[in-house]
Amino acid sequence: MSCEFSLKTFDELTSVDLYHILKARSQVFVVEQNCAYQDIDEVDFDCLHLVAYKNEKLIGYCRIIAPNSNKSKLKAAKSHNSAATVEGTTPSIGRVLILPEYRGDGLARQIMTQAIKYCRKKYGKKPIAISAQTYLIRFYESLGFTPYSEFYLEDGIEHVDMVLSLRKKVKAKNQRSSSTKILNFLLLVLALLFIAGLIYLMV
């Protein structure tokens, strides 16, 4: 599905933008998931808000949370494990949603890809953290995220912390480079043996 993306700070959002964002978040995270919790929080003030539009209608959304934001600090303060520490010092992506009628067309992957790109542009090569609902683990793994915490309940829904790091990509790239060099070397050896064989037959 083709769509347009808009990335704004909280101060750049118009009242209409904010209305549609909060309406969508309430529709998905409160009504659809039957989860009574306070969706609006102070974290929104420090976030980048990424919206997917089709024909000027909001159809998907996520927010990019800055490193050392209020949310990250609060989570780290509540826990002594390494998972909270990682999320507290890295950017994270949250409130990822697609409106029900637009699901199944790859839009979630597009939004996450855009969010990751913006994280890299703004925060460099820092790992990117997410708090994922466990039924979406495979989806996030397909984007390169790996779990780094035990399962836990958040507002009555099972979650797991996941992180996207550049290390594995760099390692995989180095492995591919090494494999290519070995293959080229073997091809060179075979070519030399072939030439040597031809010379032997000619003699």
Summary of predicted features, one role per range:
Residues 112, 119-133:
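Conserved GNAT acetyl-CoA-binding A-motif
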Residues 51, 57-67, 72-82, 92-97:
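Conserved beta-strand in the GNAT
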Residues 35-38, 47-51, 61, 95, ...:
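Short hydrophobic/aromatic beta-strand element in the GNAT-like acyltransferase core
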Residues 1-57:
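Short amphipathic alpha-helix that is part of the acyltransferase structural core
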Residues 153-186:
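C-terminal "cap" of GNAT-fold acetyltransferases
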Residues 1-16, 171, 179-199:
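Conserved N-terminal entry element of GNAT/NAT acetyltransferase domains
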Residues 129-131, 141, 146-161:
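Conserved catalytic-core motifs of GNAT/GCN5-like acyltransferases
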Residues 98, 104-117:
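Conserved acetyl-CoA-binding loop-helix of GNAT-fold acetyltransferases
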